[in-house]
UniProtKB/Swiss-Prot annotation:
This is DNA-directed RNA polymerase subunit beta'. It comes from Myxococcus xanthus (strain DK1622). Its cofactor is Mg(2+); Zn(2+). One of its GO terms (cellular component) is DNA-directed RNA polymerase complex. It comes from the Bacteria. One of its GO terms (biological process) is DNA-templated transcription. Zn(2+) 1 binds at residues 70, 72, 85, 88. Pfam families: RNA_pol_Rpb1_1 (PF04997), RNA_pol_Rpb1_2 (PF00623), RNA_pol_Rpb1_3 (PF04983), RNA_pol_Rpb1_4 (PF05000), RNA_pol_Rpb1_5 (PF04998). GO terms for molecular function: DNA binding; DNA-directed RNA polymerase activity; magnesium ion binding; zinc ion binding. SMART domains: RPOLA_N.
Length: 1403
């Protein structure tokens, strides 16, 4: 009886565990798991196809092949359950045990586990202090190792060859010492290790040693020893006596048709191990010669190696078709391994896919689902309903009925589908908006209909894209789909908080057309009392859609147009008429939807979006816009411009021929001229295409007026519907400069445009760019996907998990200014953040925002009006939450427009927001057809505001003609208004001519400074006579005759002589060195390699004149290609190729004696006004680099002293975490800004926080850390608090910046790390440490098949029960509301009467 009860017992819940531990398996453990030993390599009998006894598929060990049936057929069926057949020894039980029962192989000699032998650093070698090479010699039976030296002079662990051993035996006698070879010897040595003692000795050695290399070596060994000590693993378990055999159904043998068998590679690998093991056993029994046994042992070791990790050592074992066999490690590794193929990505049932087409009359929350698809997807629900309604009595008859597609079935399908959302997904799903929920509407045909407004989120178009449909089954799933994933709940983009549901293309065109005004249109100037009158007049054809009229709206007379009044009918009243009383292009429409969302909430916005969609399509159709050839107006002045440019270019060629400029400068100037002319032609063309004159009658008189053009091409670009000024330029202006495949710009531009047609040569030049674009796209898509994967992996466990961490720390944030221009105003950067302290008005002192209040739109306005320049806010970077992040530090959830909720997976959102545009950008390179777009190099400064000039830190020299020249590189020109408030500040480049005086009043647009953008000059501060020093023809300087010009140029070259320091000195008439006025040092100027000397020996020179100039490199086009790798480089925290040295301290620059081809730069700090040479820092900079500081300059800590990007690790060391974070955020933003992509700073901050999670221990104090160990910050702080509370010494650490790959691999969770990269390495490390994974991140829970600990899967919601009410047949209120508003619509859903916003209820 008891058996029966057990049979119906619920199986244990496989998910009821909280953590997973991984450790080494001891031989006893393996035997304990095993159900029997596999002794024979046979698999199945070729005649009966039954498994061989004791073979790899043996039924006695692994269980029966058929359910409840023993192998010989004596016992069959359930009644014999649990009996063991006395004939064939098979237990009568379900056959599925063959998926879980293990066997084992007892080895004749211990072998090393290859992971612990070869996975660097070798753990076995580390513990025994033997190099990997020597260890392999022992294991693969090539030399002997001394186990016990006894009285001989040998060392324990020393390797000796066979000859030497025999010699020693002769000297000292047979049993004077013990040696061993192969696995037994290594196992002996591991067994004799005392880990406790080893640990203590190593700690002592580390304290006593002085050599850094030794300390590192001890630390490495100590790490492994500690791991064994703490985890309870025994070192000898790294050697295997017993090998587990995995269940046969996991390495199946499948009969193919034609009598052949397909088998898993593991069976082959196991067979080799068993064969060799059996042979070794036999040889040992026969007492075979040592050399044969040794060879067999080596072969056994190799066979076991291949089974665990084929190809890791020696030759890869291949199958009959020369394909490497897949070992146990390969089953886990890589994209096709267990982790990524089956655990992180699974196929989903109840899903279908089809091509998508546009559904212009769908509502925003709907999608069109083909009937045949719906019938298949909702089958179980239909069967249930058919039975419930009494159409059928059994599931079988329901099936038949559905197959026949009887009319009742369709009625029931309608019923089933109502209010049952489905998920639509378009691959690649780059961010969470790539999967959204919709309510299905049944349609005929086979294509899914998609709402046009959600295309932007899915990045879908209708050129053959396919989408997948998934059905959420449970009530909870349907609820989540409706509440969280419904398209109507995803109006804002999580990346930047701006609406993502904005009209595009035709819709924009239609709305733009209807809000434009046309001069002399029918009914112009009429006055109406209400919008209803305008509608009536328009319906009766009395007024033109674009006529300018006056209408009373909300009690005020408004000058407007008919079209705008008609648009007003569909806009919520709260938005106000002024928001739409203008020409609405794409940007304004986005603004309108944003405004509507902020003022009236989600529901109204959805209704507005749908109505704007209908109006847009309707009016775009009515407008009848088309393109004709003559719409591409070629500017009349084009030829004139081209002639002028050619003249300029030939002048520059002449200058080059006369030797006034170098070839590089000539190239740069030519490119600049053409870039400028292309711009001019484009401007001229835009002017002609964008304005038109029109004549008409007004009060009986003919008159002519100018108005914005109705040229269709212009309309499309101006409205933002399609195309850009740049594309129009190529159609009707000139194509302009093109780039070579290498990225350089070809200096002859394409002067033709597409309307005129290109010549063969021009066409050929333009194919370069196009092809490069396509090739780039293919490569970059992969790169971008990989970047996203790394970002997700590093940030997956950043979850909002507490409300307030209580930190007192935050960041100062100001407007982002570059080149005097405000790129991002303060308001945009602080919107949605939380204030750290009270923010006070600087003038009145009133509180604008209280501490811990969210800075919303209203407060941003107040802060901006108060004129503050920076605000202290809370940030993810300074959040003190241990794991995860707190609500207050994160601030606003961008996709919802309110504070973030606990449980939001902000890390993944951040990763998607950064990764998604990466892919977008990569896919959008080729749209401009490779045309090189370079803005003419900036070479001057103009002010934008009136005010007076102040110089800040600017050192100048007056030239003989009275102009000032800037002599330092960190000077700035500041413009202040009358009250002394700073309006703008500009950095002045070294060597610039300054054209304004200090204190001068200037109007806007005055030229304040100008410089040569193509060369960096070296100027003299004093006048005198030039003398060359160490400038020797052919050694440090080459004088090259320019063939073209016949003139010579002196260029400084790298000298073979390390002592040579080419320099120019300035002397007085008597030949004495002059002193520099700023630093009292002698006036000698060192010339960097590659500089061109412009003065001759013995010339007289005046202050501010150029001694030499360094040409800037030829400019390449900026393209996100520079972008993606740059972003990856920043997130990986790599040292840039030519990293700029940055100053570690504040001080004064001087140059020392050069060494080995490097220049010595010295920074001397000043203490109380005097220079302390004892504290000076020295830097060696290779001669080829261009140093941007000059002798006597003052530098601040963290300032770059040469061209190039800074190394983030240096910034962290010198300036600390906040500055580093600011640098990373700004640099990443810079790349995206170039592409016009908006990402909120907090996303990048979230990733940077994950990169800065760890500390490197520099001094261990009395803690258990090791020197140079990397630990999580909070672990470090906790340990220190504990130690200090006991009155001991705390550890000291320095913050550590890890690249995203490194950070992912060093997470707490080994499951997450091993599924990311380097699977074997991570698992080896984890096993030795006996690591426990507490399943805190998202990834490890997905792998274990549990709910993720975020969102609705938070532990606190685990025991919530959902009460399900029976559904009532109420009509969706929103439907009703919309039916009311769209009552009788005109064609294409244009409302034909005024529509208020009298909608009620909520969906």
């Amino acid at each position: 009886m008891k058996d029966i009860f057990n049979f119906f017992e619920k199986p244990k819940d496989p998910l009821s565990f909280n953590a997973i531990r991984i450790a080494l398996a001891s031989p006893d453990k393996i035997r304990q798991w095993s159900h029997g030993e596999v002794k024979k390599p046979e698999t199945i009998n070729y005649r009966t196809f039954k498994p061989e006894r004791d073979g790899l598929f043996c039924a006695r060990i692994f269980g029966p092949v058929k359910d409840y049936e023993c192998n010989c057929g004596k016992y069959k069926r359930m009644k014999h359950r649990g009996v063991v057949c006395e004939k064939c020894g098979v237990e009568v039980i379900q056959s599925k045990v063959r998926r879980e029962r293990l066997g084992h192989i007892t080895l004749a000699t211990p072998v090393a586990h290859i992971w612990f032998l070869k996975s660097l650093p070798s753990r076995i070698g580390n513990l025994l202090d033997i190099t990997l090479k020597e260890l392999e010699k022992v294991l693969y039976c090539e030399s002997y190792i001394v186990l016990d030296p006894k009285a001989t002079p040998l060392q324990k662990g020393e390797l000796i060859s066979e000859d030497k051993m025999h010699r020693l035996y002769q000297e000292h006698g047979e049993d004077s010492f013990t040696t061993g070879m192969g696995g037994e010897a290594v196992r002996e040595m591991l067994k004799s290790l005392d880990v406790e003692k080893l640990s203590e000795e190593l700690r002592k050695d580390m304290r006593e040693t002085t050599s850094e290399a030794k300390r590192k070596k001890y630390a490495k060994r100590l790490k492994v020893a500690e791991a064994f000590r703490v985890s309870g693993n025994k070192p000898e378990w790294m050697m295997l006596d017993v090998i587990p055999v995995i269940p046969p159904d996991l390495r199946p043998l499948v009969p193919l048709d034609g009598g052949r068998f397909a088998t898993s590679d593991l069976n082959d690998l196991y067979r080799r191990v068993i064969n060799r093991n059996n042979r070794l056993k036999r040889l040992q029994e026969l007492n075979a010669p040592d050399i044969i046994i040794r060879n067999e042992k080596r072969m056994l070791q190799e066979a076991v190696d291949a089974l665990f990790d084929n190809g890791r050592r020696g030759k890869t074992i291949t199958g009959p078709n020369k394909r490497p066999l897949k070992s146990l490690s390969d089953m886990l590794k890589g994209k096709q391994g267990r982790f990524r193929q089956n655990l992180l990505g699974k196929r989903v049932d109840y899903s279908g896919r089809s091509v998508i087409v546009v559904g212009p009359e769908l509502r925003l929350h709907q999608c069109g689902l083909p009937k045949i698809m719906a019938l298949e997807l909702f089958k179980p629900f239909i069967y249930n309903k058919l039975e419930e309604k009494g159409y059928v009595t059994t599931i079988k008859s329901a099936k038949k009925m559905v197959e026949k597609e009887r009319p009742e079935v369709w009625d029931i399908l309608e019923d089933v589908i109502r209010e049952h959302p489905v998920l639509l997904n378009r691959a690649p799903t780059l961010h969470r908006l790539g999967m959204q929920a919709f309510e299905p509407v049944l349609i005929e045909g086979k294509a899914i209909q998609l709402h046009p407004l959600v295309c932007a989120a899915f990045n879908a178009d209708f050129d053959g894209d396919q989408m997948a449909v998934h059905v959420p089954l449970s009530i909870e799933a349907q609820m989540e789909a409706r509440v969280l994933m419904m398209s109507t709940n995803n109006i804002l983009s999580p990346a930047n908080g701006k609406p993502i549901i904005v009209p595009t293309q035709d819709m924009v065109l239609g709305i733009y057309y209807m809000t434009r005004a046309r001069e002399f249109a029918g009914g112009e100037g009429r006055v109406f009392a209400s919008p209803d009158e305008v509608r009536a007049a328009y319906d009766h054809g009395e007024v033109h859609l674009q006529a300018k009229v006056v209408c009373r709206i909300d009690g005020k007379r408004k000058e407007t147009t008919v079209g705008r009044v008609l648009l007003w009918e569909v806009v919520p009243r709260a938005v106000g008429f002024d928001a739409i009383n203008k020409v609405l292009d794409k940007k304004s429409l986005g603004g309108l939807i944003d405004l509507c969302y902020r003022l009236t909430g989600e529901k109204e916005t959805v209704l507005l979006a749908d109505r704007v969609r209908s109006l847009g399509y309707y009016n775009a159709t009515r407008a009848g816009i088309s393109i004709a050839l003559k719409d591409m107006i070629i500017p009349a002045k084009k030829q004139e411009f081209l002639d002028f440019a050619r003249k300029e270019v030939s002048e520059i060629e002449n200058q080059y021929l006369e030797g006034l400029i170098t070839d590089g400068e000539r190239y740069n100037k030519v490119i600049d001229i053409w870039a400028e002319i292309t711009e001019k032609v484009a401007q001229e063309m835009m002017q002609q295409i964008s304005q038109e004159e029109t004549t008409g009658d007004r009060d009986g008189k003919r008159e002519t007026r100018k108005q914005p053009s109705f040229n269709p091409i212009y309309i499309m670009a101006d409205s933002g519907a399609r195309g850009s000024a740049q594309q129009i330029r190529q159609l009707a202006g000139m194509r302009g400069l093109m780039a070579k495949p290498s990225g350089e710009i070809i200096e002859t531009p394409i002067t033709a445009n597409f309307r005129e047609g290109l010549s063969v040569l021009q066409y050929f030049i333009s194919t370069h760019g196009a092809r490069k674009g396509l090739a780039d796209t293919a490569l970059k898509t992969a790169n971008s996907g990989y970047l996203t994967r790394r970002l997700v992996d590093v940030a997956q466990d950043a979850i909002i998990n507490e409300y307030d961490c209580g930190t007192m720390d935050g960041l100062f944030i100001g407007a982002l200014v570059e080149g005097g221009e405000i790129i991002e105003p303060l308001g945009e950067r602080i919107l949605g953040r939380v204030a750290l302290d009270d923010i006070l008005d600087p003038v009145t002192g009133e509180v604008l925002v209280r501490a811990n209040e969210e800075i919303d739109e209203d407060r941003v306005r107040r802060i901006e009006n108060s004129g503050m320049d920076k605000v202290k806010i809370r940030s993810v970077l300074t959040c003190q939450a241990k794991r995860g992040i707190c609500v207050e530090c994160y601030g606003r959830d961008l996709a919802r427009g309110r504070k973030v909720s606990v449980g939001e997976a902000v890390g993944v959102i951040a990763a998607q927001s950064i990764g998604e545009p990466g892919t977008q950008l990569t896919m959008r390179t080729f749209h401009i057809g490779g045309a090189a777009t370079r803005r003419a190099e900036q070479s001057s400064l103009e002010n934008r505001y009136a005010g007076s000039v102040k110089f800040a830190g600017l050192v100048t020299v007056q030239k003989t003609d009275g102009t000032l020249v800037a002599m330092n590189r960190n000077g700035e020109i500041v413009v202040v208004d009358d009250s002394g408030r700073e309006r703008e500040r500009y950095q002045v480049i070294y060597g610039a001519r300054i054209l304004v005086k200090e204190g001068q009043r200037i109007e806007p647009g005055v030229l304040m400074a100008e410089w040569d953008p193509f060369a960096i000059p070296l100027l003299t501060e004093v006048g005198g006579v030039v003398r060359y020093e160490d400038i020797i023809e052919g050694v440090t300087m080459s004088e090259a005759l320019d063939e073209v010009t016949g003139l010579s140029r002196k260029t400084v070259i790298e000298s073979k002589d390390p002592e040579a320091r080419p320099r120019v000195t300035i002397r007085d008439a008597n030949g004495n060195m002059m002193d520099l006025p700023s630093s009292r040092n002698p006036a000698s100027y060192f010339l960097p390699q590659g500089s061109i000397i412009t003065v001759n020996d013995g010339d007289e020179i005046h202050p501010g004149e150029v001694i030499a100039k360094v040409p800037r490199e030829t400019t390449k086009t900026k393209d996100i290609t520079g972008g993606l790798p740059r972003v990856a480089e920043l997130f990986e925290a790599r040292k840039p190729k030519d990293a700029a040295a940055i100053a570690e301290i504040d001080g004064v620059v001087s140059f020392g004696k050069d060494t080995k081809g490097k220049r010595k730069l010295i920074i001397t700090p000043e203490v109380n006004g005097e220079q302390r040479t004892d504290l000076a820092k020295e830097y060696l900079i290779s001669k080829g680099k261009n140093i941007s500081v000059h002798s006597g300059d003052r530098v601040k800590a963290g300032e770059a002293m040469m061209d190039g990007s800074a190394n983030p690790h240096d910034i962290l060391k010198v300036l600390g975490e906040k500055e580093l974070a600011r640098y990373l955020v700004d640099e990443v933003q810079e790349v995206y800004r170039l592409q016009g992509v908006k990402i909120n700073d907090k996303h990048i901050e979230t990733i940077v926080r994950q990169m800065l999670r760890r500390v490197r221990v520099t001094d261990v104090g009395d803690t258990n850390f090791l020197v140079d160990e990397q630990v999580e910050k909070w672990v470090f702080e906790e340990e220190n608090e504990k130690v200090m509370s006991e009155g001991k010494r705390p550890a000291v650490g320095e913050p550590l910046l890890l690249g995203i790959t490194k950070a992912s691999l060093s997470t707490e969770s080994f499951i997450s790390a091993s599924s990311f990269q380097e699977t074997t390495k991570v698992l080896t490390e984890a096993a030795i440490n006996g690591k426990v994974d507490y399943l805190r991140g998202l990834k490890e829970n997905v792998i274990m098949g549990r709910l993720i600990p975020a969102g609705t899967g938070l532990p606190n919601y685990k025991h919530l029960d959902i009460a399900v009410e029976s559904p009532t047949d109420e009509v969706n209120e929103m439907e009703a509301a919309l039916a009311a508003t769209h009552g009788d619509t005109g064609p294409l859903g244009e409302p034909s009467r005024p529509v208020g916003t009298q909608t009620t209820g909520a969906a």
